[in-house]
């Protein structure tokens, strides 16, 4: 009997366990799926980040425009857009621009009534073009315009480069020279003079003052009427007579009068018209602008470079496809805003160790990824583990791993394509704006962002569902492959594990991973079949009757012993016999 017990122990100690699985981290992760809700998985790829505020920067790979004219000192962007005498410099080309002035006004030049027109949008309009250039010649001869002759007015509050009286180069202040009388509406045509098919931005306006000054300058104290028309857009104005504060809004020299400034955009070959009375500011030099430059609200100076410029966070370097936090407009290679953090599954469903101990025993629980990962392998790799007297061996199955990587890469690419499409959708409306400020309405933009966020979240849920199902399929395929290779040399004990009838060290496991495994190379003597061999009995003085007597005596004794044991167990179960054991 002792020999049989020893034999059973040897068989047990030589049995190794081989399991299929996926390497993972030491703790489960949670992902959301479309139909299963939250699922614990062995690995994840974070898709979102939460940025922190930083300074604005130059956009990588593009020229970024801060001020319209960096070399124009002490000039606002509106000064540059109106061509104030001391603010006429070169505007560099740029594919991205920073709207850095909250309330653009002129500095120390003739006071403008900003609220009467869309003049504040003029610098923003110019920022929206990649190339901007002021014409070298005037669009009309102001001195000989209808209602003239005129003298061109200047102002001491708008000094030129020699500190003499001056005025904006984009407009001519037409003051009647001799005929200072009231006039009926007059019309002047504004030709297209740009030479390279650019948009022509024509600036014009009118001056108004108190009644005394109106009579002195123009011979008429009544409100004057003005109209501009270009590309089917017509605008009407009536001047205000008097009532202006002495101190100007711009902080310049005290003025009793004000000017109203507007602009019109003329497409190639299109003529504009201006209908006017007294006090008109006739157009002179025009802006010729082409190309597109994306505009975003920000601040100066621009420090360093960044992948993305975000109105709330400044310069960002893109590390993830999506971000959470505060939503706002952004330009460049930017992550897309989503409401909640997103994770993409990178593994199978996680099974806790406690469950495995119950189902597979101690050795089964510690084998494979299910206990928290394999040492020495890259997270997410498919393969096999072997546990036995040799310790733990690990081997990767390259084909299965590559298939899983391809599946996850495909899902990431799909999400990336969705990201690009949504970015194009967001920026498309901005690119189409030509005559308006290049800003999307906040409410419309937020609504669109919410919709896109929901679409992305759904796409991630569906991707997680597909990845988890695909990973499970890969593991099942790996398990079937292992079972086929092991054949009768192993017993399937469930959950992707097999108990082998031979040792399986690192060499054995590498053969399995390579598909060249041969059980015969690693097998020990087995006890799968009962071998019966003939035996010869030698005559040692015992005859056949004596031998039969010994056997019958032993058999009878064994039978009696078993009957007594059965009787005692039966009586104990009926409570007819009590048994006490004392040491």
Curated annotation (Swiss-Prot):
The record marks 360-361 as: Cleavage. Pfam families: Hemagglutinin (PF00509). The keyword Membrane applies. Palmitoylated. Residues 16-551 are extracellular. InterPro entries: Capsid_hemagglutn, Hemagglutn_HA1_a/b_dom_sf, Hemagglutn_influenz_A/B, Hemagglutn_influenz_B. The chain crosses the membrane at residues 552-572. A lipid is attached at residues 579, 582 (S-palmitoyl cysteine). GO terms for molecular function: host cell surface receptor binding. It is a single-pass type I membrane protein. One of its GO terms (biological process) is fusion of virus membrane with host endosome membrane. It is found in: Virion membrane; Host apical cell membrane. SUPFAM superfamilies: Influenza hemagglutinin (stalk), Viral protein domain. One of its GO terms (cellular component) is virion membrane. Its main location: virion. It comes from the Viruses. Binds to sialic acid-containing receptors on the cell surface, bringing about the attachment of the virus particle to the cell. Plays a major role in the determination of host range restriction and virulence. Class I viral fusion protein. Responsible for penetration of the virus into the cell cytoplasm by mediating the fusion of the membrane of the endocytosed virus particle with the endosomal membrane. Low pH in endosomes induce an irreversible conformational change in HA2, releasing the fusion hydrophobic peptide. Several trimers are required to form a competent fusion pore. HAMAP family: INFV_HEMA. Major glycoprotein, comprises over 80% of the envelope proteins present in virus particle. Homotrimer of disulfide-linked HA1-HA2. This is Hemagglutinin. It comes from Influenza B virus (strain B/England/222/1982). The gene is HA.
């Amino acid at each position: 009997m002792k020999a049989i017990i020893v034999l059973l122990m040897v068989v047990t100690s030589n049995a190794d366990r081989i399991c299929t699985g996926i390497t993972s981290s030491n703790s489960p992760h949670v992902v959301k799926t479309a139909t299963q809700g939250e699922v614990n998985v062995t690995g994840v790829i974070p898709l979102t980040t939460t940025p922190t505020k930083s300074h604005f920067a130059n956009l990588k790979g593009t020229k970024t425009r801060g001020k319209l004219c960096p070399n124009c000192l002490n000039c606002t962007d509106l000064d540059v857009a109106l061509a104030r005498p001391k603010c006429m410099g070169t505007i560099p080309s740029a594919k991205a621009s920073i709207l850095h002035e909250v309330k653009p006004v002129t500095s120390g030049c003739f006071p403008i009534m900003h609220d009467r027109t869309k003049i504040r949008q003029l610098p923003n309009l110019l920022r929206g073009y990649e190339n901007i250039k002021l014409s070298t010649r005037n669009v009309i001869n102001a001195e000989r315009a209808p209602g003239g002759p005129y003298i061109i007015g200047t102002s001491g509050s708008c000094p030129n480069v020699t500190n003499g009286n001056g005025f904006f180069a984009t407009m001519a202040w037409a003051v009647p020279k001799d005929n200072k009388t009231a006039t009926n509406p007059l019309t002047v045509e504004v030709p297209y003079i740009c030479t390279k098919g650019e948009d022509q931005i024509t600036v014009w306006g009118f001056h108004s003052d108190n009644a005394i000054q109106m009579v002195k300058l123009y011979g008429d104290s009544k409100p004057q009427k003005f109209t501009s028309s270009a590309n089917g857009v017509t605008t009407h104005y009536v001047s205000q007579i008097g009532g202006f504060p002495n101190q100007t809004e711009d902080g310049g020299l005290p003025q009793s009068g004000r000017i109203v400034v507007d602009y019109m955009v003329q497409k190639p070959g299109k003529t504009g018209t201006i209908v006017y009375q007294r006090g008109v500011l006739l157009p002179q030099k025009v802006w010729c602008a082409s190309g597109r430059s994306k505009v975003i609200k920000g601040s100066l100076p621009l420090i360093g470079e960044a992948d993305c410029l975000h109105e709330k966070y400044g310069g960002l370097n893109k590390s993830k496809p999506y971000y959470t936090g505060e939503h706002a407009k952004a330009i460049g290679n930017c992550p897309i805003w989503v409401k909640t953090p997103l994770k993409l599954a990178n593994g199978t469903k996680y099974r806790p160790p406690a469950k495995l101990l119950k189902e597979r025993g101690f050795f089964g629980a510690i084998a494979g990824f299910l206990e928290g990962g394999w040492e020495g392998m890259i997270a997410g790799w498919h393969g096999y583990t072997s546990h036995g007297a040799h310790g733990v061996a690990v081997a990767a199955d390259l084909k299965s791993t590559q298939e899983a990587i391809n599946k996850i890469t495909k899902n990431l690419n799909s999400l990336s394509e969705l990201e690009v499409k949504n970015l194009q959708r967001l920026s498309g409306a901005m690119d189409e704006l030509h005559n308006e400020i290049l800003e999307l309405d906040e409410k419309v933009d937020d609504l669109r962002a919410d919709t896109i966020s929901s679409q992305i979240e759904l796409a991630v849920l569906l991707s997680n569902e597909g990845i988890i199902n695909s990973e499970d399929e890969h593991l099942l395929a790996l398990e079937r492959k292992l079972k086929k290779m092991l054949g009768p040399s192993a017993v399937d004990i469930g959950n992707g594990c097999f108990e082998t009838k031979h040792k399986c060290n690192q060499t054995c496991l590498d053969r399995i991973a390579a598909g060249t495994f041969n059980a015969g190379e690693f097998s020990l003597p087995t006890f799968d079949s009962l071998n019966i061999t003939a035996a010869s009995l030698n005559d040692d003085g015992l005859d056949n009757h004596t031998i039969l007597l010994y056997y019958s005596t032993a058999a009878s004794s064994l039978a009696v012993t078993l009957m007594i044991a059965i009787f005692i167990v039966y009586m104990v179960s009926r409570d007819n016999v009590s048994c006490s054991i004392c040491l």
